[in-house]
Swiss-Prot record:
It comes from the Eukaryota. This is Developmental and secondary metabolism regulator ve-1. GO terms for biological process: sporulation resulting in formation of a cellular spore; trehalose biosynthetic process. It is found in: Nucleus; Cytoplasm. Residues 363-372, 485-494 have a biased composition (Pro residues). Component of the heterotrimeric velvet complex composed of lae-1, ve-1 and vel-2; Ve-1 acting as a bridging protein between lae-1 and vel-2. It comes from Neurospora crassa (strain ATCC 24698 / 74-OR23-1A / CBS 708.71 / DSM 1257 / FGSC 987). It holds the Pfam family Velvet. The C-terminal PEST domain is a region rich in proline, glutamic acid, serine and threonine residues that is required for the light-dependent regulation of development and secondary metabolism. The gene is ve-1.
Amino acid sequence: MGAQVIAAASNGLCHDDEPIASVKSRITRSGRKLWYSLRVVQEPLRARACGSGPKSSADRRPVDPPPVVELRIFEGESFEMAQERDVTFQYNANFFLYATLEHARVMAQGRLQTPSANTPPVLTGMPVSGMAYLDRPKLAGYFLFPDLSVRHEGRYKLTFNLYEETKEDKDKDPEEPNAPPDGSPGSFDFRMDIKSHDFVVYSAKKFPGLTESTPLSRTVAEQGCRVRIRRDVRMRRRDGKGNSGGNDYENGEEEYRRARRTATPDTAKQEAYRQRSMSGSTERTPYSSISDPQRRPSMADYPPQYAAQTPTSGGHLGFLGGNTHHQYPAQPPPQSFAQPHSVPPSPVYPTSQRAPYQHQPSSYPPPPPPHQPIFQSEHHTSRTYAPINPASRHDSIHQSTKQYTLPPLSEAVSPTQPHHQHPSIAPHRLPVTALPPLQVDRFSSASHNQHPMVSPSNMAAPPYPRAYSVSNSGGLTSAGGYNQLPPPPPPPPQVAGSKRAHDQTFRADPEMRRYQDGARERESVDDKEPPLCTFKYRRADGSVECKQADIGGY
């Protein structure tokens, strides 16, 4: 072909920072001398191995950044003179660049030729690129490779081979003996090649990530070429370890600016959460246990409390002082309250208002213990229940030392009277148990003589027992501290499913045996049918008639 190559540029041994360039010249049929200048303006730096499995095409990363090769054509007797005449856009021909992959370091051939050593590195993607005529960054032709990938990790380099298809006969090579005739279809002629710098192909685990698109890639994409542009940084931490020096990323400053630019406060999460309900909590006030000792948690229900009413001398009741009988208010009918066993009974908080009942001396015998029955007169036939309202009870502060007579049971206070005027004593809170109805049949009238009238100051309300049971004599006795009612009888055994028992279907006759060898049950006298000598029938008026059967015809 009569091509001449400049040795200083064609060997490609340049500094890594400088782009590799290659220059080659040839003489056409018409005698023109053309100079081809091929230069890699954007070198590949890294790539991620995509493997060779069935899913290798689904998650494939291209070589980053995409290689870009520049081609310029000059015409002149020498290369220095030819640079003054650039004919890249005027030259009528088609060019394409074909990329191949090779190892950066030539592997020595070993004694054992393994298949992996003989297999060349596999390049996937689009290895062919046509020339694009662009104005920027220079008036030249550019070859772009935005879709090149490598299947195996290692250190490689790319080799770009330039092919030309001439359109005019004057621009073709001089005649050769073995050249095809002019009437043959067009062909591509190899012009030159150029190699890129070495780049590293990482595995999927060690791949540091794709970098931001270079200014050259953006410039080429702005002119209509199909190049992937990444405006965000996709760098991965090195070796999976943190670095206190702030160099976790290769471009830490760009990553920091990007993070600040894209950080947007989430206003949806700034809504105030609904406050937690404290209906059953003791954290209502900082001093809830001191200011409200009678407060009980809402999760446990306690039975109504009983109060011993002791009216004062200036009370509104008109019957005070008119009777010598004393009376204890009858207890209300029992009510069942469900309370979990894990809830302890409410503690009793002693206050200074109950001190007179606990420390004043008394000249009378102490009240009966909880297991003793409450004595009342025999002639009391009607009983009323003192209304209980724990919310309106008030502890009596001033206790009078005078003695008062209590009205008979028939003149007890009606439930409609107000309760805030009756002094009462806050009873002890007891664990909830189901109490049976109180039954009081008879009591000795002599018990009234043994217990004279006791003033409110000398009288202490006896604690109520936890559970009661009725004795044989009709009196009310205590069954113990935590005794419960007798358990209900066990339910009758249920037959599994809805099937009938065996005895309901078959006879349970001990004399019944298994019949074998054609044996049958012997007929009894009762089982034999009576002779058909007579028959009965009922007439229309309801009478029964008997008639002798005529069996003589047989």
